[in-house]
Amino acid sequence: MQRSSLKSKKIKEQEIAVKKAWRSTYKNSYEEGLYFLLQGLNEEEFSLDKVLHQIKNKIPIQYILKKWFFYDGEYILNNHVLIPRPETEVLVNHIIQNFSSCRTILDLGTGSGCIAIEISKKLLNSKITGTDISKRALEIANTNNLQSSNPVNFILSDWFSEIDEC
């Protein structure tokens, strides 16, 4: 075999391996994921080498992009908060539909604040408090809180330790 065809075959094998690794890690096709990733990164300057290194190290796309959509909002994320899951949107819907008469709602371990914030956007007559033990998580939650007209009160607390009333 000629050297160029061996090189071409090796590149093709590497491409297949990358696509399989992508699908296994991110649970979508390489083309879909890469398109989405590049769309998100297009909004800011980025180093392709750094992004490829992060992908190789199985860093979630949400952390690479530093933001993610959840329910009706876009949330800033980093490795100090968990990534919002689509399944959690079912919980938000359930709370909005079944607990609209509640005057106070408490979100323990709020992380990015996405659950509490999305609920606060719909239940305008409710006072919503989110707690977290991590100062860094609360910094993210407070930044994300700017998108709500019914801001959530975020408190540094180990579960109920700093909660006066519930």
Go through each PLM region and give its residues.
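N-terminal auxiliary segments of SAM/dcSAM-dependent transferases
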Residues: Q2-L65
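Proline-centered flexible-loop/turn and helix-kink motifs
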Residues: R23-K27, L124, N150
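Short N-terminal micro-motifs specific to bacterial/archaeal maturation
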Residues: S24, N28, N79-L82, L146
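Short, conserved SAM-binding/catalytic segment
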Residues: A141-V152
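Short loop/helix-cap segments at secondary-structure boundaries that form the rim of catalytic
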Residues: E165-C166
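SAM-dependent Rossmann-like transferase core, predominantly class I methyltransferases
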Residues: H53-L123, I128-I140, F154-S157, S161
